[in-house]
Amino acid sequence: MKKIRKKELYREGEPRITPREMRDKGVKYVLDKIKRQPGYYVTNTERDLSQSDFKNRIMPHTQLLVAEERNQAGFFSLEITGGASVHVDMLRKQINPLEKLQVLGERMPDTMFQTLCRGINLFGYRPYPDNVIRMTVRTFARYVHVWRVFDFLNHIPNMVPVFEEVKAAGCILEPSICFSTGPEHTDAYYVRKVGEILDVTGEDILLCIKNHGGLGTSKRIGDLVRAIHDRYPDLVIHYHGHNTDGEDIGRIVAAVLNGAKIVDASDHAFTGFYGPPPLLSVVDILADYGYQAAGLDRQAVIETSNKLRPER
């Protein structure tokens, strides 16, 4: 495969955040930069879109096709691995998920890669031994910069081994609270869970509100972001949702208006029914509220979808 020349797009003082910046200046510097930046950042959740709407059928060929445009786009991160994608890479596509990350990383040197990890279930469907968890995290941490970690019951001890290894690797740790709408899922419940996470991790983390069910109203999400922000004002909140009910753009807007600094969306040419909402719709609506996407190159986002559309 022909190697393309790496092109460093980052310049000192720009709002975008690069892997080099994280390596050279550390996680705390990155978190402080996010807090100082007006507006909000966008994560492109291609992995979740691929899993939710295409059964992880998006191939490395397609990812390489738009690598240059995505690298130019200025996303906070690109979720490109994790969840069910690792086993699909190995068992169905018959590719090495680590080699995929290495090749894509060479073509996207200015973009942080993100993964979704299921705590002690890692990228699988059952609990794994402690040594397997730690070895796996160390191995993937060579290529992955942002680690979103969750336990679907919000049982914090199930995430601790991953927390420890991500921190030790110098990567950005993003513990999650999984959102639901039962009578017990109050603001007080979630604020308490955030406290349990911080007791383990300290405050040098991102916190994800993980609304993978696409539940709740925009007001409900806004109230939750505000409750967490009021209790922990220095915490950087990252909202993740699905557009299954068609309402997630409203929830994203409410999250940003109430203090979230990073939100998830996907390339508009690939969005469908169950994944995150279309990126440009999110950006345009928030712009009408006076919030700009930090570091985002709109033309690169458009060119990405122009290339992706025939691949759908």
Locate the predicted segments by residue:
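Catalytic cores and adjacent flexible loops of soluble metabolic enzymes
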Residues: M1-R148, F152-R312
